[in-house]
């Protein structure tokens, strides 16, 4: 059995979707093993990069698969890949125990559509499993307090990097 410390990170993207008022999309997670309590169930869209896919293409795909949103403009990306470890207590169940956490490339995107474009109940034209049960717009600086604690350092970095883009 592979030791936790020797497991690789899953390569992913994260998206800060910013509306015209400078607020950021967050979704309430539909459930899963990452949950630690009912307070920290909100997050921005994120997901894995497929083999041969570049991070920007993955970001657009994941955003559509989780929110149905296609009306976006790229504002910025964080140069570094940000990582977090999942707690050992869930590492054996998350991603079938193959990863110790995630390595993420983060993008800031301007949402250019109308709120009616967002569909978290039947995302991606109804062809994808719902990741969120509801959503809202939130000031970016509030997000680190709404995320599961083990992702908080990543969200703090994202909030710092994208603060001027999101009205902060």
Curated annotation (Swiss-Prot):
Top-level taxon: Bacteria
This protein's record includes keyword ATP-binding: no
EC number: 3.6.1.-
Gene Ontology biological process terms, A to Z: nucleoside phosphate metabolic process; ribose phosphate metabolic process
Motif annotated as Nudix box, chain positions: 47-68
Domain spans labelled Nudix hydrolase: 8-160
Enzyme class: hydrolase
Its job: Accelerates the degradation of transcripts by removing pyrophosphate from the 5'-end of triphosphorylated RNA, leading to a more labile monophosphorylated state that can stimulate subsequent ribonuclease cleavage.
Family: Belongs to the Nudix hydrolase family. RppH subfamily.
Protein name: RNA pyrophosphohydrolase
Organism of this sequence: Bradyrhizobium sp. (strain ORS 278)
């Amino acid at each position: 059995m592979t030791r936790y410390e020797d497991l690789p990170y899953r390569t992913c993207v994260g998206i800060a979707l910013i509306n015209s008022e400078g607020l950021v999309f967050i979704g309430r997670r539909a459930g899963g093993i990452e949950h630690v309590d009912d307070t920290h169930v909100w997050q921005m869209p994120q997901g894995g990069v497929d083999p041969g896919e570049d991070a920007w293409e993955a970001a657009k795909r994941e955003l559509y698969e989780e929110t149905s949103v296609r009306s976006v403009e790229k504002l910025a990306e964080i140069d570094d890949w940000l990582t977090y470890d999942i707690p050992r207590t869930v590492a054996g169940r998350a991603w079938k125990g193959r990863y110790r956490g995630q390595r993420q490339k983060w993008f800031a995107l301007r949402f250019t559509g109308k709120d009616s474009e967002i569909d978290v109940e039947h995302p991606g034209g109804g062809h994808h499993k719902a990741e969120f049960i509801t959503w809202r717009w939130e000031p970016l600086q509030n997000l680190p307090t709404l995320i599961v604690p083990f992702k908080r350092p990543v969200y703090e970095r994202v909030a710092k990097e994208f603060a001027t883009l999101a009205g902060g």
